[in-house]
């Protein structure tokens, strides 16, 4: 017979009252990063031949034709900066500068660069949670890890804006035969897609942390406008400009959604999976055509294409918000970082 014995366990150590807030702040930073990754296309200005940029977590990334710079506001109020040379794809491979093709290539490069910028800003924000000996050290994400994150982001985009609308439109067609025609089916599919996009943009704008990202987005636009107007880059000068810019990624995404409706009508395929495969196959083509439209509209404000990009400009009322002077200062610093590298690239003066 086994004798009974009392099992004594040591009392657990009391949890410090500081641990819970630190864990929550760290989790909040990770959630901000994940949300910003999904917003990447809406925050970018993916024009290869002009100055553009992207809002990041508590900062701004700016790019010139041959360089990019990023400035992030640290928790202590100072600004952390970083800059690197940037290779223009169309100079190395001339075919990448062809119309439509250049849009796909430039947007792909913008996604990779945008993700790197977001990682940098997230590292700066998370620096306060690291051990003292590791603070200030930046770890570059490996190529495969970055590829996995970008694949996840693209997969999320395809699932939310391609798969879900197609499922919903198919169910409506089965329930109501009036939606069975080629035109009506794709209109319904497009309306659902745009509705999901608007709901996602509006929903994220309710989160105060992402709203600050939208303020930095506004600071980026104002700074680009001031630069293009050859105005001295000071906070008072920059603040005089608009937060709505025609080359914004928000306008690009809305243009993509509108063009999708018209393009899908031209391909009367049958069967759910055939339609889904068609949407995936046409995505690069539609992105390239939309890029050319945004590019043309930015140069010809009174054209029909400019009119088609108006919905995206209206949507910038959500994705860009009025920045304060400290946020504008970040955007100016980022652009100055990029332009300093631009001037000395390869030891020659590129832009005076």
Predicted segment positions?
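Polar-ligand-bearing catalytic/cofactor-coordination segments
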Residues: 26, 31, 40-52, 56, ...
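Structural motif marking the loop-to-transmembrane transition
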Residues: 100, 104, 140, 144, ...
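Alpha-helical transmembrane segments of polytopic integral membrane proteins
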Residues: 114, 121, 161-165, 169, ...
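Juxtamembrane "helix exit" motif at the C-terminal ends of alpha-helical transmembrane segments
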Residues: 120-124, 153-178, 256-278, 287, ...
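Hydrophobic alpha-helical membrane-embedded segments
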Residues: 67, 95-117, 189-214, 286-299
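Membrane-interface elements of multi-pass transporters and channels
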Residues: 122, 126, 167-179, 206-207, ...
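Divalent-cation
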Residues: 2, 12, 18-133
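Hydrophobic alpha-helical segments characteristic of transmembrane helices
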Residues: 128-177, 181-207
């Amino acid at each position: 017979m086994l004798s009974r014995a009392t099992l004594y366990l040591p009392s657990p150590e009391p949890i410090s009252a500081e641990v819970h807030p630190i864990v929550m702040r760290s989790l909040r930073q990770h959630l901000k990063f994940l949300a910003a990754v999904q917003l990447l296309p809406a925050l970018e200005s993916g024009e290869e031949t002009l100055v553009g940029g992207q809002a990041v977590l508590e900062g701004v990334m700016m790019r010139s034709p041959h360089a990019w710079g990023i400035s992030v506001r640290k928790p202590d109020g100072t600004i952390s900066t970083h800059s690197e040379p940037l290779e223009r794809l169309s100079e190395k491979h001339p075919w990448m500068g062809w119309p439509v093709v250049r849009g796909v290539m430039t947007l792909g490069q913008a996604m990779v660069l945008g993700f790197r910028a977001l990682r940098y800003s997230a590292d700066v924000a998370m620096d306060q949670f690291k051990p003292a000996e590791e603070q200030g050290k930046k770890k570059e994400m490996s190529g495969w890890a970055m590829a996995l994150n970008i694949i996840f982001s693209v997969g999320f985009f395809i699932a939310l804006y391609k798969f879900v609308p197609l499922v919903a439109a198919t169910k409506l067609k089965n329930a109501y035969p009036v939606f069975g025609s080629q035109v009506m089916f794709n209109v319904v599919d497009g309306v659902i897609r745009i509705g999901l996009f608007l709901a996602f943009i509006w929903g994220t704008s309710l989160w105060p942390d992402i709203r600050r990202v939208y303020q930095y987005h506004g600071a980026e636009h104002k700074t680009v406008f001031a630069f293009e107007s050859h105005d001295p880059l000071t906070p008072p000068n920059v603040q005089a400009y608009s937060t709505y810019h025609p080359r914004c990624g928000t306008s690009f995404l809305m243009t993509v959604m509108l063009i999708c409706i018209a393009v899908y009508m031209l391909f009367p395929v049958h069967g759910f999976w055939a339609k889904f495969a068609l949407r995936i196959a046409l995505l690069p083509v539609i992105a390239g055509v939309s890029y050319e439209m945004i590019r043309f509209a930015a140069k010809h404000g009174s054209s029909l294409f400019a009119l088609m990009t108006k919905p995206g400009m209206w949507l910038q009322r959500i994705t860009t918000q009025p920045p304060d002077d400290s946020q504008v200062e970040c955007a100016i610093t980022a652009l100055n970082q990029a332009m300093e590298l631009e001037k000395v690239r390869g030891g020659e003066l590129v832009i005076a």
